[in-house]
A protein has these predicted regions:
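Tryptophan-centered motif/residue detector
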Residues: 38-40, 80, 173-175
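N-terminal type II signal-anchor transmembrane helix
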Residues: 2-37
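Glycine-rich portal/gate segments that line the openings of hydrophobic small-molecule binding cavities
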Residues: 8, 49-52, 57-61, 69-71, ...
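Juxtamembrane/transmembrane-helix boundary motifs in multi-pass membrane proteins
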Residues: 1-6, 198, 202, 206
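Short, charged, low-complexity patches
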Residues: 201, 205-221
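Short acidic N-proximal helix/loop "leader" segments that mark the beginning
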Residues: 24-63
Length: 233
């Protein structure tokens, strides 16, 4: 009996320590890494540049710029980006997470390592699902150059207008493609957000959710790079 109680106590201590470390991580890691994750891979010039979609949320509470160089032409990279989404070609990241959270049902059963012909005609007004409850609306689709999407409780026309409700949220995801001199692509992801969240909700969005989103965004960019470069061979 003493051995059993000692074992239970040991398990409780270990679990308590793990929970404490997790909470400590939620509090400390996001602010300590924010300056890095908000500009992951981007140059100072890229972070300071105005890109398509910036005018939708002109004075954002959240603003980040991530970038990666891909040894594949913009045509291939854009094709992969415009086919992303739930019930589409996936997110080029951790499929197990999207399966677990109901954000998958991808056309190939996992993120597609091919260009899917039937998903190559994205246009303004199209909705790209994150999951069954949340979707982005395409605001700008400039083939091989930029794909800008908006999510939240507002339309692009409502932001800053008298019709804007008292409680709202909005965030943009802009994929910017720039050809490189070597025939590749400089892929830039500009994300901006604003809203009326306060207190704990704002802390969660500014801290843990922002940090987690940075990790998933980078994983997606790495997946796009890997897939595009394989297709370019």
């Amino acid at each position: 009996m003493t051995v059993i109680l000692a074992t239970i106590k040991w398990i409780a201590v270990v679990l308590g320590a793990m929970i404490a470390l997790f909470i400590l991580g939620l509090v400390l890691v996001p602010p300590l890494t924010r300056s890095f994750t908000d500009s992951w891979g981007a140059t100072e010039q890229e972070t300071a540049t105005t890109f398509p979609g910036d005018d939708i949320i002109p004075a954002p509470r959240e603003n980040s710029t991530k970038a990666i160089t891909i040894d594949a032409p913009p045509q291939i990279v854009y094709a992969l980006i415009q086919q992303m989404g739930q019930h589409r070609a996936g997110w080029y990241g951790w499929d197990w997470f999207y399966n677990a959270t109901g954000s998958s049902d991808f056309v190939d059963g996992h993120y597609s390592t091919r260009i899917v012909p039937e998903l190559q005609a994205v246009k303004v007004g199209d909705r790209i699902n994150i999951n069954d409850a949340v979707a982005y609306t395409v605001i700008e689709a400039n083939t091989d150059q930029a794909l800008v999407m908006l999510a939240g409780s507002l339309t692009a026309q409502q932001i800053g207008e008298p019709s804007q409700p008292e409680t709202w949220s909005a965030n943009t995801m802009a994929w910017i493609l720039r050809p490189t001199s070597a025939g590749g692509t400089r892929l830039i992801l500009r994300m901006r957000a604003d809203g009326t969240e306060t207190g704990f909700a704002r802390w969660m969005w500014n801290g843990p959710f922002n940090f987690g989103g940075a990790l998933f965004s980078r994983k997606t960019m790495d997946g796009i790079k890997r897939t595009a470069e394989a297709l370019a061979q």
